[in-house]
Amino acid sequence: APMIVRKRDGGFGYDATDLAAIRRRVGKLKADRIIYVTDVRQSHHFEVLFQVARMAGFLPDDVEAEHVGYGMVLGPDGRPFKTREGGTVSLSDLLDEAETHAAPNIALAAIKYADLSNGLQKDYVFDAERMVQTTGDTGPYLQYAHARVSQILRKAAAEANPNVDPEADLDAMDWGRISVLDEPAEQQLALLLSRFGEIVEVVATDLTPHKLCTYLYELAGAYSVFYEQCPVLRSTGEVRGSRLALCAATRRVLGRGLDL
């Protein structure tokens, strides 16, 4: 399909604006990677835009230009989500709906996780009640896992030093190192923890945040198995120290993953 840079009446449309934006981002802002995040239905427009920009010399071969398309949010009937009046549903509307089922922080996490875990180009049904559940593949489930690990570490810190500040930064404490991995649950958890950097690199390169969500869900599940099969606070000696280090690493990775 052709790209109309200038209209017959002399005016300029979106195509010209997009080309000018690329020229400025590369020439003035020195961008080496440009990412557009819009409705997946605009994929063809950006395919043509990038081709024309390269032909015009605005987009050199050593500058990456990518379009990340996202799907639609659907209502319970499987159709595009609309207000009762038939208008477009805003993010604040979705947050208000989620907050009828959970506290604001949990509701926000639930929506963000549900949106990112689905795979950007896929449509998904907005179900606030399901999104705020603390079981299954949801944001609140990961928040709960992070809170549970934190509780264990705070108990361990209090046992070691009764005068420790209950609000102390757990990440700033020295939890030793992971040195004993005799149990299968310990081994599986440690293996997943070792893959965090690899997963983040893949997500950043391929622009696939759902892969990070899948990883964090698997990590939370592996920690749950570890928690059930490998007592932490009831263990002693080197085993206890190693398991506390595993807990600290799990908390750190879950926290950083959720921040991302």
Predicted features along the sequence, with ranges:
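Non-catalytic interaction-recognition regions
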Residues: 1-260
